[in-house]
Protein backbone atom coordinates (compact mmCIF):
# COMPACT_ATOMS: atom_id res chain seq x y z
CA UNK A 1 0.00 0.00 0.00
CA UNK A 2 1.47 3.35 -1.10
CA UNK A 3 -0.03 6.84 -1.18
CA UNK A 4 1.10 7.47 -4.75
CA UNK A 5 -0.24 11.02 -5.10
CA UNK A 6 1.70 12.31 -2.08
CA UNK A 7 3.84 15.29 -3.13
CA UNK A 8 7.35 15.63 -1.73
CA UNK A 9 8.72 18.84 -0.22
CA UNK A 10 12.22 19.46 0.97
CA UNK A 11 12.84 21.24 4.26
CA UNK A 12 13.98 24.82 3.87
CA UNK A 13 16.22 24.96 6.92
CA UNK A 14 18.28 22.26 8.57
CA UNK A 15 16.05 22.51 11.64
CA UNK A 16 12.58 22.45 10.07
CA UNK A 17 11.98 18.78 9.29
CA UNK A 18 8.71 18.69 11.25
CA UNK A 19 7.52 21.86 9.52
CA UNK A 20 8.25 20.29 6.12
CA UNK A 21 6.48 17.05 7.10
CA UNK A 22 3.40 18.96 8.23
CA UNK A 23 3.52 21.04 5.04
CA UNK A 24 3.54 17.86 2.91
CA UNK A 25 0.67 16.29 4.86
CA UNK A 26 -1.50 19.41 4.84
CA UNK A 27 -0.95 19.91 1.11
CA UNK A 28 -1.93 16.27 0.56
CA UNK A 29 -5.11 16.86 2.60
CA UNK A 30 -5.81 20.06 0.58
CA UNK A 31 -5.60 22.31 3.64
CA UNK A 32 -4.80 25.84 2.42
CA UNK A 33 -1.94 27.08 4.60
CA UNK A 34 1.43 28.64 3.87
CA UNK A 35 4.82 27.51 5.07
CA UNK A 36 5.10 30.69 7.17
CA UNK A 37 1.74 29.98 8.81
CA UNK A 38 2.87 26.43 9.64
CA UNK A 39 6.09 27.75 11.20
CA UNK A 40 4.05 30.09 13.41
CA UNK A 41 1.39 27.50 14.25
CA UNK A 42 4.02 24.90 15.27
CA UNK A 43 6.03 27.52 17.18
CA UNK A 44 9.12 26.43 15.29
CA UNK A 45 12.48 27.63 16.58
CA UNK A 46 15.88 27.93 14.93
CA UNK A 47 17.05 24.79 16.77
CA UNK A 48 14.02 22.71 15.73
CA UNK A 49 10.43 22.06 16.71
CA UNK A 50 9.28 19.73 19.48
CA UNK A 51 7.33 16.87 17.89
CA UNK A 52 4.42 17.40 20.26
CA UNK A 53 3.86 20.89 18.86
CA UNK A 54 1.89 19.23 16.07
CA UNK A 55 -1.01 19.36 18.55
CA UNK A 56 -1.32 23.10 17.87
CA UNK A 57 -2.81 22.23 14.47
CA UNK A 58 -6.10 21.38 16.19
CA UNK A 59 -6.76 25.15 16.26
CA UNK A 60 -7.24 24.85 12.49
CA UNK A 61 -10.10 22.40 13.00
CA UNK A 62 -7.91 19.39 12.25
CA UNK A 63 -7.70 16.20 14.26
CA UNK A 64 -4.22 15.43 15.54
CA UNK A 65 -3.32 12.12 17.13
CA UNK A 66 0.10 11.92 18.78
CA UNK A 67 1.09 8.62 20.36
CA UNK A 68 4.09 6.67 21.60
CA UNK A 69 4.90 2.96 21.30
CA UNK A 70 3.55 2.60 17.77
CA UNK A 71 4.07 -0.54 15.70
CA UNK A 72 4.40 -0.98 11.95
CA UNK A 73 0.88 -2.40 12.02
CA UNK A 74 -0.59 1.01 12.90
CA UNK A 75 0.39 2.40 9.50
CA UNK A 76 -1.91 0.28 7.35
CA UNK A 77 -5.29 1.47 8.71
CA UNK A 78 -4.24 5.11 8.50
CA UNK A 79 -2.82 4.71 5.00
CA UNK A 80 -6.01 2.89 3.95
CA UNK A 81 -7.95 6.01 5.05
CA UNK A 82 -5.56 8.14 2.98
CA UNK A 83 -3.73 9.50 6.01
CA UNK A 84 0.07 9.62 5.96
CA UNK A 85 1.84 9.19 9.31
CA UNK A 86 4.56 11.52 10.60
CA UNK A 87 7.13 9.72 12.72
CA UNK A 88 9.75 10.98 15.14
CA UNK A 89 13.06 9.18 14.55
CA UNK A 90 16.81 9.18 14.92
CA UNK A 91 18.61 8.43 11.65
CA UNK A 92 20.77 5.75 13.25
CA UNK A 93 21.74 3.13 10.68
CA UNK A 94 19.72 4.75 7.88
CA UNK A 95 21.92 4.25 4.82
CA UNK A 96 20.60 7.25 2.91
CA UNK A 97 21.99 9.38 5.76
CA UNK A 98 25.45 7.82 5.23
CA UNK A 99 25.96 7.07 8.94
CA UNK A 100 25.07 10.58 10.09
CA UNK A 101 22.85 10.43 13.17
CA UNK A 102 20.35 13.15 13.94
CA UNK A 103 16.91 13.52 15.46
CA UNK A 104 14.44 13.91 12.64
CA UNK A 105 10.86 13.68 11.40
CA UNK A 106 9.74 11.85 8.26
CA UNK A 107 6.40 10.92 6.70
CA UNK A 108 5.40 7.28 6.22
CA UNK A 109 3.45 6.96 2.96
CA UNK A 110 3.54 3.24 2.34
CA UNK A 111 4.11 -0.23 3.69
CA UNK A 112 4.86 -3.53 1.97
CA UNK A 113 4.43 -6.45 4.36
CA UNK A 114 5.51 -9.07 1.80
CA UNK A 115 8.93 -7.47 1.35
CA UNK A 116 9.06 -5.90 4.84
CA UNK A 117 9.52 -2.36 3.53
CA UNK A 118 8.43 1.06 4.76
CA UNK A 119 8.22 3.96 2.28
CA UNK A 120 9.00 7.42 3.62
CA UNK A 121 9.29 10.99 2.47
CA UNK A 122 12.39 12.34 4.17
CA UNK A 123 12.30 16.15 3.87
CA UNK A 124 16.07 16.46 4.14
CA UNK A 125 16.46 14.86 0.71
CA UNK A 126 15.17 15.91 -2.70
CA UNK A 127 13.97 12.48 -3.86
CA UNK A 128 11.11 10.37 -2.51
CA UNK A 129 9.82 7.97 -1.58
CA UNK A 130 12.76 6.28 0.10
CA UNK A 131 12.35 2.64 1.07
CA UNK A 132 13.67 1.23 4.32
CA UNK A 133 13.49 -2.31 5.61
CA UNK A 134 11.33 -2.80 8.68
CA UNK A 135 14.48 -3.56 10.68
CA UNK A 136 16.33 -0.40 9.62
CA UNK A 137 13.27 1.79 10.10
CA UNK A 138 12.52 0.35 13.54
CA UNK A 139 16.04 0.99 14.85
CA UNK A 140 15.62 4.71 14.20
CA UNK A 141 12.00 4.86 15.33
CA UNK A 142 12.73 2.97 18.57
CA UNK A 143 15.22 5.70 19.52
CA UNK A 144 12.25 8.07 19.83
CA UNK A 145 9.95 5.59 21.62
CA UNK A 146 8.13 4.90 18.34
CA UNK A 147 6.34 8.24 18.47
CA UNK A 148 4.01 9.15 15.62
CA UNK A 149 1.44 11.75 14.65
CA UNK A 150 -1.55 11.55 12.35
CA UNK A 151 -3.22 14.70 11.08
CA UNK A 152 -6.67 14.41 9.61
CA UNK A 153 -9.70 16.36 8.56
CA UNK A 154 -12.44 16.22 11.17
CA UNK A 155 -14.97 14.73 8.72
CA UNK A 156 -12.73 11.70 8.15
CA UNK A 157 -13.29 10.72 11.76
CA UNK A 158 -17.06 11.26 11.90
Predicted regions and their residues:
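Active-site-adjacent structural segments surrounding the nucleophilic cysteine of cysteine proteases
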Residues: 1-48, 71-72, 91, 99, ...
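A structural signal for well-ordered alpha-helical scaffolds and beta->alpha junctions
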Residues: 18, 49-50, 68, 130, ...
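Noncatalytic regulatory segments and standalone regulatory/sensor domains
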Residues: 44-46, 58, 80, 90, ...
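Helix-adjacent hinge/juxtasegments
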Residues: 55-83
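Structural recognition of the beta-strand scaffold that forms the well-ordered cores
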Residues: 65-66, 85-88, 119
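Short beta-strand or tight-loop elements
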Residues: 104
Amino acid sequence: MLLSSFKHKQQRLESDCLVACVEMVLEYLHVPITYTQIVKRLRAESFGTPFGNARFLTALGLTVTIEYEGTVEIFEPYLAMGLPVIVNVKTIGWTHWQNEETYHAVVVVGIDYDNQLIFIHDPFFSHAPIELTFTTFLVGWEEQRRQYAVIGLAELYE
